[in-house]
A protein has these predicted regions:
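Glycine-centered flexibility sites
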Residues: 30-32, 96, 114, 145, ...
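Intrinsically disordered, low-complexity coil segments
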Residues: 36-40, 48-51, 126-130, 224-228
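A contiguous, surface-exposed recognition patch within enzymatic or periplasmic domains that forms
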Residues: 2-46, 155-211, 218-221
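Residue-level preference for alpha-helix termini and adjacent loops
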Residues: 7, 18, 40-42, 54-61, ...
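Hydrophobic, proline/glycine-rich low-complexity stretches
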Residues: 1-98, 279
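Catalytic-pocket segment enriched in acidic/His residues
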Residues: 189, 194-272, 276-277
C-alpha cells in the first residue's frame, strides 16, 4: 500500500491563483445560469443597466487548488473518485481577485477495498489577507485500503418525513460539460468518448462539480432569493454520474433557521448528490 496514513496534518505549500470578471461569467454559464436570458443577469452579465455583477458562491470549487494530495505518497490517479465536497464562504467572492491557498490533509481512513482521503483548503484574499472561503473534499482511492486503520466517522443525516419545502428543476444542456471544462477541469472523461468508454460509459459524463454548481444555484434561489451575500455554505456526497442533457431536480427541506438539507436527483429519479446540507442567512 503506497499511500501513507501518517500524512494526516501534512500541508501543501501556499499557492496563488487569480480570476477575472470573464472567468466568473463563464463559470456561471457553465453551471446553467442564463438559460432564461432575462434571469440571473447579475451572474451572467457585467454591463446590464442598474445591475452589479456578482459571483456564484459555488465558483469557490474552481478557485485555489491546494489539496495536499502530493503529501500522501504514490497512488494511481485513475483510481481516485471524488466522493464529497463542501464549501464555507466567509464573505462574498469578489468579481475579480487573487487568493493564496494552503491545503491540509485532515483525514485518511481505511475502507477495506480503498482509502478515503480528506483534504481541507483555506483561501485568503491577497489584497487584505483575510479569509475568503474554506473547501473540504474527500476522495476514495480504490485499492489503497486494508491496513487496519480507522474507518472514519459516520455521517449523521436524515431526510425529513415530509414533502420538500422547495423543489427546483434545471435542464443541463447537451454541451454542458464542454462549457464547464473551460473553468479549469479538463479531465477527458467529460469530453473524450474514447476515454469515457475506458471508464465504462457510452459517452462523456458531466463533471460532478458541475452538478454541484447546478445544485448550488437551486439552493441560492430557493433559500437566499438569489442573493449571494446570504449563501454561507453547502455540502454534498456524489452518488451517481450525470449525463449532459439530463434534468436535475433539487429537493430542499428547511430544518432550522438558516439551515436546510437537500437531495439532487437525475431525470430518472435516482439520487446523484446525496446527504446535502446548506447554511444561509434567513
Amino acid at each position: 500500500m503506497p499511500i501513507n496514513p501518517d500524512a494526516v496534518g501534512a500541508k501543501s505549500d501556499p499557492t496563488r491563483s487569480s480570476w477575472t470578471s470573464k472567468d466568473a461569467l463563464l463559470y456561471a454559464v457553465g453551471v446553467g445560469a442564463g438559460q432564461s436570458p432575462l434571469d440571473e443577469l447579475q451572474y451572467t452579465t457585467e454591463n446590464s443597466a442598474d445591475i452589479d455583477q456578482k459571483v456564484l458562491p459555488t465558483m469557490a470549487v474552481v478557485l485555489g487548488f491546494g489539496g495536499g494530495f502530493d503529501k500522501i505518497g504514490d497512488f494511481n490517479p485513475a483510481m481516485l473518485v471524488h466522493g464529497e465536497q463542501s464549501i464555507e464562504l466567509h464573505r462574498e467572492i469578489p468579481v475579480s481577485g487573487e487568493i493564496e491557498t494552503v491545503g491540509e490533509i485532515t483525514g485518511i481512513y481505511d475502507k477495506g477495498k480503498g482509502a478515503v482521503v480528506v483534504s481541507e483548503s483555506r483561501s485568503t484574499l491577497v489584497s487584505d489577507g483575510e479569509p475568503l472561503f474554506t473547501k473540504t473534499m474527500s476522495a476514495f482511492i480504490r485499492g489503497e485500503g486494508g491496513w487496519g486503520g480507522d474507518s472514519g466517522p459516520a455521517l449523521e443525516w436524515e431526510q425529513p418525513d415530509r414533502d420538500p419545502d422547495e423543489t427546483v428543476t434545471y435542464t443541463t444542456r447537451p454541451e454542458q460539460a464542454l462549457i464547464y471544462r473551460l473553468s479549469g477541469d479538463r479531465n477527458p472523461l467529460h469530453a473524450d468518448p474514447t476515454f469515457a468508454a475506458m471508464g465504462g460509459f457510452d459517452r462523456p459524463i458531466l463533471h460532478g462539480l458541475c452538478t454541484y454548481g447546478f445544485t448550488g444555484r437551486g439552493l441560492l434561489h430557493a433559500l437566499c432569493g438569489g442573493d449571494s451575500s446570504k449563501f454561507k455554505g453547502m455540502y454534498g456526497r456524489f452518488s451517481s454520474p450525470v449525463f449532459p442533457g439530463e434534468d436535475l431536480t433539487v429537493n430542499i427541506w428547511r430544518t432550522a433557521d438558516g439551515e436546510a438539507v437537500y437531495q439532487t436527483q437525475g431525470g430518472d429519479g435516482r439520487v446523484v448528490l446525496d446527504k446535502g446540507t446548506c447554511s444561509y442567512t434567513a
